[in-house]
């Protein structure tokens, strides 16, 4: 079996069906719940400065690259970058139990994603280039290793001055503890959340964030110290996911950088600090996850093998929906637990937030995720004033419109809805009340039918895996997760609330849109509307004097 065929087999085996769910333990073993906070015991610890001063730009300015002037790289701006991407945003408390919320959403609030900083000398941080692990509970950095300025120059050769790197990894066990074999999907979905969170956080500082596509997973792991097996428990290893180049300047084109292999080898040969903390006392081993993870390891690839966005692709001018700052919207993001079934949004609001999802080389976060766009939206519209309820489709790449039309139900209307901007490829497929259908295909969850709308993210599936390789399976989830992160923030800006839905019946979703065969697959669901708040919960600040006593995230 080819690696891409293994990825497809995994996807098929981990589908939820009306007749039964993907394989998991079947219950929650609370005694082995993973610690959501990785620490490297013995590593030098550097708290990052925090400030209540909000100097971020208006939220509406962060989606275009030319609207925010770059801020200098310093200890304060490094802190702000993490504070608006991977940090804790609040704590919740109920009957003495406390759990953390973060700026980057996570399936089940289990947070498999870890972050790393690779940076040159910075006043107040270090006189030498270093690699750090980000500790969100303390909003601090843990020094993993340092290296010479000569090696640093080799590593960043080709990047503008003061550039830095951010690395991301996944601890699959955190998701597998609850979700079993389907956990690999959720780790990749959360990686998409995190990539978009980093891109958007960088945009608040005027920094451009680029995914370094050519790098292999092996090289990313070596650079971040993730291949040092003696420093991790064997069931709690971190899978390398991505290395981001963060550029604090208005460079016109993304870098075509592949960090020097010789520099990475020299860094790996240095002295590394810290031992990864144990997250659980025991583990359940899922061989299917091991198999798909091995198949989807990314090799080194050609710089331009993913192509480019279509010429002219870009977001239309969207009127500001809020006067709030970017920092306020990012840090108030929450996942809805229930929706009221009555709140509607206007047609123009609907068009504006969908416009944020259109890819383009100058649009955040799509400049980070990069081409090609392979994920489209199948929408269940319930309560949008000025639009008929029914099924709609958003085609996010023009070359996919004809294949999607041919793949979906022949009787669909494919009509342009009234007042829809010409730049937004949105189509009415069929009219009618679809609240029950939306809830039914989303694992019978009422929240999918109680919002203004819900959606399934439908990816072109077989051809990209055949063309690029099994590793592109992960990229489909990254793109879907990034869409989710933008929708989360757009809901907050519109004064409503949203949530991602990872539990859905895969093939019934395809049936709802008339999709037959494996060419298109649903990757992630989402809903937004008027929230029903749980008055039993107390909200506590993210960081304060009693933070060391706070608990861990429940599922």
What are these model-derived regions, one by one?
Residues 1-486, 494-555:
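N-terminal accessory segments that position/regulate proteins before the catalytic core
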């Amino acid at each position: 079996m080819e690696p891409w065929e293994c990825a497809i087999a995994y996807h098929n085996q981990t589908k939820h069906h009306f007749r039964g769910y993907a394989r998991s333990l079947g219950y929650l073993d609370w005694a082995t719940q993973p610690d959501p906070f990785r620490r490297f015991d013995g590593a030098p610890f550097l708290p990052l400065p925090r400030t209540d001063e909000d100097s971020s730009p208006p939220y509406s300015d962060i989606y275009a690259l030319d609207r925010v002037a770059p801020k200098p790289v310093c200890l304060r701006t490094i802190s702000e970058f993490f504070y608006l991407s991977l940090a804790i945003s609040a704590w919740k408390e109920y009957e003495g139990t406390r759990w953390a919320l973060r700026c980057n959403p996570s399936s089940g609030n289990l947070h498999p994603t870890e972050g790393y900083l690779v940076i040159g000398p910075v006043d107040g941080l270090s006189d030498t280039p270093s690699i750090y692990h980000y500790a969100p509970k303390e909003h601090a950095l843990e020094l993993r290793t340092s290296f010479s300025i000569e090696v640093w120059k080799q590593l960043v050769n080709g990047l503008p001055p003061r550039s830095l790197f951010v690395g991301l990894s996944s601890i699959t066990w955190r998701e597998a503890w609850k979700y079993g074999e389907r956990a690999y999907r959720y780790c990749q979905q959360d990686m998409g959340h995190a990539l978009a969170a980093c891109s958007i956080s960088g945009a608040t500082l005027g920094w451009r964030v680029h995914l370094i596509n050519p790098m292999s997973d092996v090289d990313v792991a070596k650079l971040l110290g993730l291949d040092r097996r003696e420093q991790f428990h064997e069931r709690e290893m971190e899978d390398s996911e991505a290395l981001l180049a963060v550029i604090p300047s208005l460079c016109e084109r993304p870098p075509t950088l592949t960090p020097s292999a010789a520099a990475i080898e020299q860094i790996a040969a240095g002295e590394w600090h810290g031992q990864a903390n144990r997250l659980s006392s025991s583990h359940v081993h899922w061989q299917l996850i091991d198999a798909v993870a091995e198949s989807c390891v990314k090799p080194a690839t050609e710089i331009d093998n993913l192509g480019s966005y279509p010429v002219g692709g870009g977001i239309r001018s969207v009127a500001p929906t809020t006067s709030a700052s970017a920092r306020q919207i990012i840090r108030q993001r929450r996942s809805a637990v229930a929706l009221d079934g009555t709140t509607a949004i206007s047609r123009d609001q609907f068009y504006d937030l969908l416009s944020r999802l259109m890819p383009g080389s100058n649009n955040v976060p799509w400049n980070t995720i990069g081409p090609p766009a392979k994920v489209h939206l199948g929408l269940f519209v319930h309560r949008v004033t000025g639009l008929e309820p029914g099924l709609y489709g958003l085609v996010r790449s023009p070359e996919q419109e004809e294949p999607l039309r041919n793949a979906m139900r022949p009787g669909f209307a494919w009509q342009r809805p009234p007042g829809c901007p010409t730049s937004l490829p949105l189509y009415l497929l069929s009219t009618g009340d679809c609240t029950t259908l939306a809830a039914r295909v989303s694992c019978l969850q009422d929240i999918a039918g109680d919002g203004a709308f819900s959606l399934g993210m439908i990816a072109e599936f077989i051809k990209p895996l055949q063309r690029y390789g099994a590793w592109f399976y992960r990229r489909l989830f990254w793109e879907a997760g990034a869409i989710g992160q933008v929708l989360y923030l757009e809901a907050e800006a519109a004064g409503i609330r949203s949530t991602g839905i990872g539990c859905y019946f895969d093939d019934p979703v395809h049936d709802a849109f008339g999709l037959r065969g494996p060419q298109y697959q649903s990757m992630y669901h989402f809903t937004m509307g008027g929230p029903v708040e749980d008055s039993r919960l107390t909200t506590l600040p993210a960081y304060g004097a009693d933070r060391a006593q706070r608990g861990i995230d429940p599922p």
